[in-house]
């Protein structure tokens, strides 16, 4: 894939091909790591049901913590990529923005992961610890040929707007410079400003799905705009796993990301 021409590690390239579509060179990832931060939310109480639904809808990968994989994160259905999330923190912690490392790259490999991910809150009081973790783990990933996704979120006492183009661009660039192969970050809300974020980041950017939107059309239009601005995919959790038609909304996202269909056409995939 052209966007990964700078990566010479064969192991990384093989794994990246499992989570990125070879034709579109984009990805649709469904994060389901929310159980650690927020508890057993609706939609992920039984991860196997949701994993099967998003796999049937065409998603490229699911993302979750190691425990769910060991307990069985899927039941039947088509193959789907697996991303192991290495960071943890809870909403009931004295410092919800602090994320700590709870597994290893080697453990993720033993579970058959196609990539690992880390969460970094840029601007948090403990952000320097997360930067150190990202930098060190990127070296381990390079050694083992494991793709690394950095979730780079502007979040902390000095962050007034988490979608501010300047802070989003800074967060994305920071993740790339510390060794991430793929950056997940906020969409700025505007294609023109997001283009500048993409220009300033040497690693491909996948947008976060964000909080649950009011309408499917609003959400899908955001995905459409981000792809046209240079985004290389979407990683959306709640807007997918809490949808009434999980398979349908996943298929709608895939239609936009991989086939560049219009929002009106993609909405036809949703049956409920």
UniProtKB/Swiss-Prot annotation:
Annotated residues that bind 1-deoxy-D-threo-hexo-2,5-diulose 6-phosphate are located at 33-37, 153-155, 209-210, 237-238
Catalytic residues, chain numbering: 33, 153, 184
Q: Which UniProt keywords apply?
A: Amino-acid biosynthesis, Aromatic amino acid biosynthesis, Schiff base, Transferase
What outcome is recorded for mutants in which this gene has been deleted?
Cells lacking this gene require both aromatic amino acids (AroAAs) and p-aminobenzoic acid (PABA) for growth. In the presence of PABA and AroAAs, growth of the mutant strain laggs about 30 hours behind that of wild-type strain. By complementing the mutant strain with the expression of aroA', the strain grows in minimal medium with acetate only. Aryl acids do not replace the requirement of AroAAs for the growth of the deletion mutant strain.
Q: Which GO terms describe its molecular function?
A: fructose-bisphosphate aldolase activity; hydro-lyase activity; transketolase or transaldolase activity
As its record notes, the protein acts as a catalyst of: 1-deoxy-D-threo-hexo-2,5-diulose 6-phosphate + L-aspartate 4-semialdehyde = 2,3-dioxopropyl phosphate + 2-amino-2,3,7-trideoxy-D-lyxo-hept-6-ulosonate
Which SMART domains is this protein grouped with? Answer: DeoC (SM01133)
* InterPro entries, per the entry: ADH_synthase, Aldolase_TIM, DeoC/FbaB/LacD_aldolase, DeoC/FbaB_aldolase, FbaB-like
Query: What biological-process terms (Gene Ontology) are attached?
Result: amino acid biosynthetic process; aromatic amino acid family biosynthetic process
Q: Which cysteines are joined by disulfide bonds?
A: none
Q: Which SUPFAM superfamilies match?
A: Aldolase (SSF51569)
Give its E.C. classification number: 2.2.1.10
One Pfam family of this chain: DeoC
The enzyme's main class, written as a single word, is transferase
The superkingdom listed in its UniProt entry is Archaea
User: What does the annotation say about its assembly with partners?
Assistant: Homodecamer.
Q: Per its database record, what is this protein's job?
A: Catalyzes a transaldol reaction between 6-deoxy-5-ketofructose 1-phosphate (DKFP) and L-aspartate semialdehyde (ASA) with an elimination of hydroxypyruvaldehyde phosphate to yield 2-amino-3,7-dideoxy-D-threo-hept-6-ulosonate (ADH). Plays a key role in an alternative pathway of the biosynthesis of 3-dehydroquinate (DHQ), which is involved in the canonical pathway for the biosynthesis of aromatic amino acids and which is also a precursor for the biosynthesis of p-aminobenzoic acid (PABA) in M.maripaludis. Does not possess fructose-bisphosphate (FBP) aldolase activity.
Tell me its family. Answer: Belongs to the DeoC/FbaB aldolase family. ADHS subfamily.
Protein name (record): 2-amino-3,7-dideoxy-D-threo-hept-6-ulosonate synthase
Query: To which species is this protein native?
Result: Methanococcus maripaludis (strain DSM 14266 / JCM 13030 / NBRC 101832 / S2 / LL)
